């Protein structure tokens, strides 16, 4: 498989990694009245790309380059994820990615990542095995950070799929520039609003999405 084909495959929302059950906080944002239409969804997605997307992609790129060992990357992710609920969501998605990766690269030492690695840690190892550049790996993570929340909002708000697709096209340049920044070095930030939404979501009864 070529590098481009590998990149497109990893960005495919149909991959059986469990990512489809996570809304990236947009369900709670909708419940709180912060996201109500396409315009407010755009603002939410921009915020998520510039914070969670940037941080996750930067740690994954560092793992891919070999600048961070898995245990160090795990600690760096925890330090940038104050919300326990957000950490749990990250580890759930990381475990799902490793489950798939074991089937694709069975010869790799996946046990070194631990039982429930953060998504960034698992993605960094996958990116290295797939032969992706740090820039391409970062772009894949930033892009799926955006599209996961966009798709969830489309379902929850019954938005026109075409309108949401147009919005994701419009945000593609932001994804590209954010990925380029992430590939340079570790991003050191968090977003209190997104952390609060994640925690409230975990404490709410019967949410539709896992996060």
Curated annotation (Swiss-Prot):
Keyword Cytoplasm: yes
InterPro entries: UreF (IPR002639), UreF_sf (IPR038277)
GO cellular component terms, semicolon-separated: cytoplasm
Predominant cellular place of this UniProt entry's protein: cytoplasm
GO terms for MF: nickel cation binding
Disulfide bonds: none
Subcellular location: Cytoplasm
Entry keywords, A to Z: Chaperone, Cytoplasm, Nickel insertion
Keyword Chaperone among record annotations: yes
Region of interest (Disordered), residue spans: 68-93
General function of this protein: Required for maturation of urease via the functional incorporation of the urease nickel metallocenter.
PANTHER family associated with the record: UREASE ACCESSORY PROTEIN F
HAMAP family (UniProt xref): UreF (MF_01385)
Assembly and binders: UreD, UreF and UreG form a complex that acts as a GTP-hydrolysis-dependent molecular chaperone, activating the urease apoprotein by helping to assemble the nickel containing metallocenter of UreC. The UreE protein probably delivers the nickel.
Family to which this protein belongs: Belongs to the UreF family.
Name of this chain's protein: Urease accessory protein UreF
Organism from which the protein derives: Mycobacterium marinum (strain ATCC BAA-535 / M)
Organism lineage: Bacteria, Bacillati, Actinomycetota, Actinomycetes, Mycobacteriales
Gene: ureF
């Amino acid at each position: 498989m070529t590098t481009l084909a590998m990149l497109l495959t990893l960005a495919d929302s149909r991959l059986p990694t469990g990512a489809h059950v996570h809304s990236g906080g947009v369900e709670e944002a909708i419940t709180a009245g912060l996201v109500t239409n396409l315009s407010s969804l755009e603002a939410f997605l921009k915020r998520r790309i510039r914070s969670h997307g940037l941080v996750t992609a930067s740690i994954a790129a560092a793992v891919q380059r070999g600048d961070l060992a898995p245990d160090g990357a795990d600690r760096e992710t925890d330090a940038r994820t104050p919300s326990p609920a957000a950490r749990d969501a990250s580890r759930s998605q990381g475990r799902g990615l490793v489950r798939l990766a074991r089937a694709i690269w069975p010869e790799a030492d996946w046990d070194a990542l631990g039982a429930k690695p953060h998504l960034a840690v698992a993605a960094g190892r996958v990116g290295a095995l797939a032969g992706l550049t740090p820039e391409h790996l970062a772009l894949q993570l930033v892009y799926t950070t955006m599209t996961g929340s966009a798709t969830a909002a489309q379902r929850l708000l019954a938005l026109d799929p075409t309108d949401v697709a147009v919005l994701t096209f419009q945000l593609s340049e932001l994804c590209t520039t954010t990925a380029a920044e992430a590939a340079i070095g570790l991003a050191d930030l968090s977003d209190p609003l997104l952390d609060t939404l994640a925690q409230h979501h975990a404490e709410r009864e019967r949410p539709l999405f896992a996060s």
